[in-house]
Amino acid sequence: GAGLKRCTGVCSSAERTRLLIALVVTVAGCVGDGGYESRKSPPMPWETSTSEAAAPQREARRPAAPAASAKGAPPSGSLPPIPVASEREARVLVDRLLPANVRDRGAWTEDITRAFVALHMAMTAERLCAAIAVIGQESGFQSDPTVPGLARIVWRQIEQRREKYGIPKAVLDLALLKTSPDGRSYRVRIDALRTEAQMNALYEDLSSEVPGGRALLAGFNPIRTGGPMQVSIAFAEEQVREKPYPYAAPDSVRKEVFTRRGGVYFGIASLLDYPASYGQMIHRFADFNAGRYSSRNAAFQDALARVSGEKLSLDGDLLRYRADGSPAAEASETQRATLSLRSRLNLGEEAILRDLKLEKSLAFEQTPLYLRLYALADSTTGERRPRELIPRIALKSPKITRPLTTEWFAHRVEARFRQCLERGES
């Protein structure tokens, strides 16, 4: 109120705290709405010369969907069909598969190899190329990739939130003039924003200045994905609880995501470190964008729609979820359609819900619900229904400036994947 407006020179501790809280409220949520692509796609190899390849913000044409064999096998030739026998051989293979214009090849080779070793995953050309393709798509092999127009996006989001929460402009302007821990004012730092790592650091500095802010405001950090593979920070935090991190214990998992080594490790884990029945790598690319098992679940939704006659969103989410990740009480459209088939499936409501709760695991494929639904779908349509389907999701975020979908993303990465396999053939 009036006290805040009078605070132009020396502020009391309480007034400073209120100013900072006002600033945190307006910054929280900026650019973090939607966890998908945070920058325009890096150009494909055939769209740019070598000298231009380091400009990931350039607009790129969508390639035609690449041809794939029925089982998604890599092209025949000199690529090793079995894992390489040693880390030394793996490094040689990774260097061979990286695009020619990648800078710091040795560092990228080392971090990719160490991630596979730490995750105890066999290093085949197909798996290595999957990781290389995602890195190329998400960051153009920049460990801290720039987001074109990030400062402008943040200012727009700040203004929207200022109006939403009724914060007087004079109060916000005063808060922005405060000197931050790095010696610059918060206004100057926002004007200079170029990367998500910088945005993350700004928010962390803000929250650290509010008494108890690190604990109180941690869940409101607007940056939810980051690093060269744009991996989810929530996923990274869960990963270190399940498996030992291969490097020295970091000050924070969040900060480690923004490093090359951490971003590569967590990204490869998200992409490849889970069992799936997919015959083609493109469905892992779709899952990387939409969530694990989304391609399998979208196919399940398609089969369910055929049997029930209901029009369903093929988004790969079978249930509704709360912010904490637990299933919501409100039934999803997929759940309602499934319940409408109780008698035909010979399953009760409790059994159906029990099976649907396994949608984020491989075990879902062995449930009575999954097996009986597909038996119905196959017999009803007279053909074997697909068991995997790229989810149909429109990607939305303040950072996205043109229509993008999960299908676009998956085909884009698949094209890079095929290019990588061809490099191994040459």
How would you describe each model-predicted region?
Residues 7, 29-426:
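Cell-wall glycan-active module
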